[in-house]
Amino acid sequence: MDQSVPSENQPETGEGRTIIDIAGIMKMIPHRYPFLLVDRVIDIVRGERGIGIKNVTASESHFAGHFPNHPVMPGVLIIESMAQTAAVLVVDALGTDAEGRVVYFMSIEGAKFRRPVVPGDQLRIECERLQHRGNVWKFRGTARVDGQIVAEASFAAMILRPSPAQQAEA
């Protein structure tokens, strides 16, 4: 049963359609170029799971050194794209309760990388909530290219208000 509920960041619902575009994502998480690693979210079942999309392009700065003449997306950035997709899911689930708070990455377990991700690939990032207790959320993430798993991991995140010093810098 689809439990997606449209919000101001979700003009449409249903797999394959953009339900949170890049502008909506930028309202939900603090990441910006060159470290914003999810382009849109195409499906959400509120508080349970979602699917993000990351278009991998040759113009991304990490490809200059990883590796020259043989660009490969660093695995840690694939994991970060999972974490950012999960952060969008947390903010979406909490709604107005998430205002003024930031989702921080806490831990990772069982990360596996199956094949290289290169410019021109489109990552399909599937995140499923495993547990939610208080401010801590645990997820299982899988990244696919053309239907094949390229990376997977379990990870945890915590949503908190930034410290006064961090807020002053913003």
From Swiss-Prot:
Catalytic residues of the enzyme: 66
GO cellular component assignments: cytoplasm; membrane
EC number(s) per entry: 4.2.1.59
Role played: Involved in unsaturated fatty acids biosynthesis. Catalyzes the dehydration of short chain beta-hydroxyacyl-ACPs and long chain saturated and unsaturated beta-hydroxyacyl-ACPs.
Lineage, highest ranks first: Bacteria, Pseudomonadati, Pseudomonadota, Alphaproteobacteria, Acetobacterales
Enzyme class: lyase
Main localization category: cytoplasm
Family named by the database record: Belongs to the thioester dehydratase family. FabZ subfamily.
GO molecular function, one term: (3R)-hydroxyacyl-[acyl-carrier-protein] dehydratase activity
Stored Gene3D superfamilies: Hotdog Thioesterase (3.10.129.10)
HAMAP family in the cross-refs: FabZ
Catalytic activity of the protein: a (3R)-hydroxyacyl-[ACP] = a (2E)-enoyl-[ACP] + H2O
InterPro entries hit by this protein: FabA_FabZ (IPR013114), FabZ (IPR010084), HotDog_dom_sf (IPR029069)
A Pfam family the protein falls into: FabA
Protein name stated in the entry: 3-hydroxyacyl-[acyl-carrier-protein] dehydratase FabZ
UniProt KW keywords: Cytoplasm, Lipid A biosynthesis, Lipid biosynthesis, Lipid metabolism, Lyase
Native source species: Granulibacter bethesdensis (strain ATCC BAA-1260 / CGDNIH1)
